[in-house]
């Protein structure tokens, strides 16, 4: 199965689908350590503190605030969003009335900017974007910074304190420069381009790749598809999540022809999501990048484990959330959500009587006197032999799967909303490190025993389900992924509506 094409259609609205995966109890890729210390807020008033009154700004403080608002566009904000055309004139007006208006406007803009840097522009949150920014009293914080003469330090603390955010900001400047210079050429459609080909399309391919990545050092005067160009195409395919064939097939061509301005908007959307993250991350954590279909484990900020994952389909979207894995279930049965049972399994039984029994399904009683469909644990169970539970309102979790076919594909968004893992027992071994009872051999013995067991973790592991369609690799280069849920488009639309 090849990767589906879902090249960004910016500003469109995505229909949200309910996420349902069920549990047996009935209940950034990231590429390097996140900043888990941050700059801190030593001058921030505690939530219960008395409101700090405003006081006049000194001229040097005014200059710092104006400079910050003027460069807000470098953080992905709209041009002039916090810097209206009359701002500077009113701030420096000789007339006392206009000057007072300018001072009030300046305060309004810097407070609005501070809230925006904390991800608070959006108010109409989709149901399955459960990772939301923390409340933030920007006005009181600003007044305190003025009072303590720490305006510059306060401003420096406003953007997300993560290396990956800073790298996205650098990438934003670079891609904006590409747009300003005219973007990159479009490659005409036609037969698959592969080694040995020649002609105008190959010449356009060379030019296209060099505009985005000058370090490839391609000869843009040549129209030959040689070994050097093959390596460059493979490099592009790795950066964009395609099979590294070195051939320009339909999906690779569609990706190459995405406009540079669309890449700018994609970066802007991902910078916005970083504003929703907790400012201090746990040093040990699991990150799932839904868009890239990858899971990464960090231990003490060091990359410890990574593997492919299979998140929900576009009609069964895996939600954005943060929680903690507190238990692991061995040989888990699957309580099938009623929506999935009615949509998928009851029709199969109607078409092929005996299907449910043949695949290990049965009906069980529920506490409210009803009945629900359950798939027994075992080799055929959709949850495989192990699942990782964490509290959340969507009844989703990480789990094993009896079918590993998807892990060999580029497009792995195939689940009902939960996240399937390529090597779940490797993760279990990591989570039980230091536990003298649940050794790898003990886990395998328990699985072979066939009984369902829930094991509480001595140290719950934070887990972040995130959606990065642009993220830096270990060398700081940008990787792009398809907007499989149209969430970039939806987010950009919500930002535009927040004006």
Annotate the PLM regions.
Residues 1-11:
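Bacterial N-terminal signal peptides that target proteins for export
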Residues 4-5, 28, 363:
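Positively charged, low-complexity intrinsically disordered regions
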Residues 5-6, 60, 422:
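Small/flexible residues
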Residues 18-20:
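C-terminal motif of bacterial Sec signal peptides marking the signal peptidase cleavage site
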Residues 22-25, 38, 111, 131-138, ...:
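Well-ordered beta-sheet/strand-loop patches within structured domains
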């Amino acid at each position: 199965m090849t990767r589906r094409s879902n090249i960004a259609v910016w500003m469109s609205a995505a229909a949200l689908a309910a996420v349902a995966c069920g549990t047996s109890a009935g209940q950034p890729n990231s590429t390097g350590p996140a900043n888990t210390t941050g700059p801190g807020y030593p001058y921030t008033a505690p939530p219960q503190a008395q409101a700090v009154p405003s006081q006049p700004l000194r001229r040097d403080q005014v200059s710092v605030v104006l400079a910050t608002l003027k460069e807000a566009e470098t953080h992905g904000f709209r041009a002039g969003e916090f810097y209206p055309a009359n701002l500077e004139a009113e701030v420096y007006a000789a007339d006392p009335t206009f000057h007072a208006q300018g001072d009030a406007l300046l305060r309004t803009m810097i407070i609005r900017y501070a809230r925006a840097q904390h991800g608070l522009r959006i108010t109409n949150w989709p149901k399955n974007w459960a990772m939301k920014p923390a409340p933030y009293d920007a006005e009181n914080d600003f007044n305190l910074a003025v009072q303590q003469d720490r305006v510059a330090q306060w401003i420096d603390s406003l953007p997300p304190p993560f290396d990956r955010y800073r790298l996205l900001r650098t990438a934003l400047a670079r891609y904006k420069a590409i747009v300003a210079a005219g973007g990159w050429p479009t490659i005409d459609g036609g037969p698959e381009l592969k080694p040995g080909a020649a002609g105008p399309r190959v010449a356009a391919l060379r030019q296209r790749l060099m505009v985005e990545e000058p370090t490839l050092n391609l000869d843009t005067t040549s129209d030959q598809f040689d070994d050097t160009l093959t390596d460059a195409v493979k490099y592009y395919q790795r950066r964009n999540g395609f099979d590294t064939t070195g051939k320009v097939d339909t999906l690779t061509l569609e990706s190459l022809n995405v406009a540079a301005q669309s890449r700018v908007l994609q970066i802007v959307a991902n910078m916005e999501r970083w504003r929703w993250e907790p400012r201090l991350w746990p040093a040990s954590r699991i990150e799932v990048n839904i868009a890239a279909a990858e899971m990464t484990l960090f231990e003490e900020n060091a990359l410890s484990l990574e593997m492919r994952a299979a998140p929900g389909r576009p009609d069964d979207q895996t939600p954005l959330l943060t929680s903690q894995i507190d238990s692991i279930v061995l040989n888990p049965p699957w309580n099938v959500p009623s929506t999935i049972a009615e949509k998928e399994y009851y029709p199969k039984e109607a078409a092929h009587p005996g299907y449910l029994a043949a695949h290990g399904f049965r009906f069980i009683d529920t506490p409210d006197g009803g009945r629900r469909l359950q798939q027994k644990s075992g080799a055929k169970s959709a949850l495989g032999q192990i699942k990782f539970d964490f509290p959340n309102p969507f009844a989703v979790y990480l789990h094993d799967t009896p079918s590993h076919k998807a892990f060999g594909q580029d497009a792995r968004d195939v689940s009902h909303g939960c996240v399937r893992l390529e090597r779940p027992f490797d993760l279990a071994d990591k989570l039980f490190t230091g536990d003298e009872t649940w050794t790898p051999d003990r886990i395998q013995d328990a699985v072979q025993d066939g009984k369902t067991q829930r094991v509480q973790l001595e140290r719950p592991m934070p887990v972040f389900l995130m959606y990065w369609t642009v993220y830096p690799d270990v060398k700081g280069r940008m990787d792009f992924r398809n907007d499989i849920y149209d969430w970039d488009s939806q987010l950009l639309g919500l930002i535009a509506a927040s004006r």
